[in-house]
Design a protein with these regions (language model features):
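Conserved glycine-rich "GG(E/T)P / GGGxP" loop and the immediately following alpha-helix
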Residues: 92-114, 201-208
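Conserved strand-turn element in the central/C-terminal portion of the radical SAM core barrel
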Residues: 124, 128-131, 168, 181-207, ...
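Core AdoMet radical
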Residues: 57-105, 120-137, 141, 146-179, ...
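Catalytic cores of alpha/beta
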Residues: 133-144, 200-218
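Generic structural signal for hydrophobic
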Residues: 85-88, 115, 141, 185, ...
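Alpha-helix-loop-beta-strand connector modules within alpha/beta enzyme cores
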Residues: 106-125, 170-192, 241-266
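N-terminal pre-triad scaffold of radical SAM enzymes
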Residues: 16-59, 93-96, 148
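Auxiliary Fe-S-binding modules of radical SAM enzymes
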Residues: 1-36, 188, 210-340
Length: 340
């Protein structure tokens, strides 16, 4: 009996499954997915023990009950995904998410080559830094056809990283190594062809998160921002979502830093690390709406392709990462939510 594992099989996000017609359903407010997210799959799973992650070894559910970034990730043949994607002009990019598994690097290279041979889609890779020990591995991804990579640092500080992903949970990941791999990736792919993932709400202050975003920017990596959502069965299932006002402020801070309009040094924080002054007038920035959209790798049009509709919150709202340009009424809500 054939094992349904990578590279022949991959998991897709629920949004991708709906868009490709594997499942029936529609998107709230007619949102359209622009980037396919694929996840490597092995029977042994991921060796990480990250306390907030749906794929964690420490999660108290069976493999078939696992979600990742809030939603189900059904398993399909890679070839069938490719065939269905060919007829979807709205899809601009595909991102391959590695997991920490001995075969992941080899299989990722195979999947990149297949995608570049059989489609005209741009290819990104969300890499597992713990498996990367030399720049050559990243150069191989670029030669295979990937044009961008992402690195999920997730936690905004060394202390939180160790506590939730590293030695504090018996996990294999190391903060310094992750940042070393960010530098390797920038060298291999070029400045700002690399993204770091950061999750707001793991216990950091707004000042600490702004500093992490700035560190990425200084290194040559853009930030792709997520809001913590508790995964059922994970050690952090009982933790609350970060307050919406906190997330909105960090979204705007990220935009200012990544668009090179200002820096974390120019921003002011109170004694609790809460952002109270962006160092500039923010009215016009809030009005354009774009700072509050999902941040991710771009598509053919130069706009975000990895827009992950409702992968960060329930469609019933409030929307944290807008998968489309916010409407005027959304902007008014955002202004009220920011509490500045």
């Amino acid at each position: 009996m054939e094992q349904k594992i990578s590279p022949q099989y991959v998991q897709t996000s629920l949004a991708a499954s709906l868009t490709l017609g594997f499942q029936s359903g529609s998107f709230y407010r007619n949102a359209k997915l622009k980037g396919l997210n694929l996840l490597l799959h092995y029977e042994e799973g991921c060796s990480g023990r990250c306390h907030f992650c749906g794929l964690s070894k420490s999660r108290q559910v069976g493999p078939k009950g696992k979600t990742f970034i809030r939603v189900d990730w059904p398993l399909y043949p890679l070839e069938e995904i490719i065939e269905r994607a060919k007829g979807k002009d709205q899809i601009h990019r595909v991102c391959i998410s590695m997991i920490t598994h001995p075969k992941a690097l080899e299989d990722t290279l195979k999947i990149i080559q297949i995608l570049r041979k059989e489609t005209d889609l741009s290819v990104s890779v969300l890499i597992s830094p713990t498996l990367i020990h030399h720049e050559e591995s990243l150069v191989a991804m670029k030669k295979a056809g990937a044009d961008r990579v992402g690195i999920a640092i997730d936690a905004g500080t060394l202390e939180l990283f160790d506590q939730l992903r590293g030695k504090g949970v018996g996990g294999p990941h190391q903060w310094d190594h992750y940042w070393d791999v960010v530098q390797m990736a920038v060298k291999a792919f070029g400045r700002f062809y690399v993204g770091i993932h950061l999750i707001v709400g793991l216990g950091e202050t707004e000042k600490e998160m702004a500093a992490a975003i700035q560190r990425g920017q200084n290194t040559g990596a853009l930030t792709h921002l997520f809001s913590f959502f508790p995964e059922k069965g994970s050690p952090m299932e009982g933790q609350s979502l970060p307050p919406l006002n906190q997330y909105r402020r960090i979204q705007l801070a990220r935009w200012i830093i990544n668009e090179n309009l200002g820096s974390a040094k120019q921003m002011k924080f109170d004694g609790n690390g809460r952002l109270i002054d962006f160092g500039m007038d923010i009215n016009s920035l809030v009005q354009i709406g774009e700072p509050f959209m999902t941040s991710g790798c771009p598509g053919r049009d130069g706009k975000v392709a990895c827009n992950r509709p409702y992968g960060n919150e329930r469609p019933s709202g409030p929307i944290r990462n807008f998968p489309f340009m916010p409407e005027p009424e959304d902007i008014e809500e955002i202004r009220a939510q920011m509490k500045i």
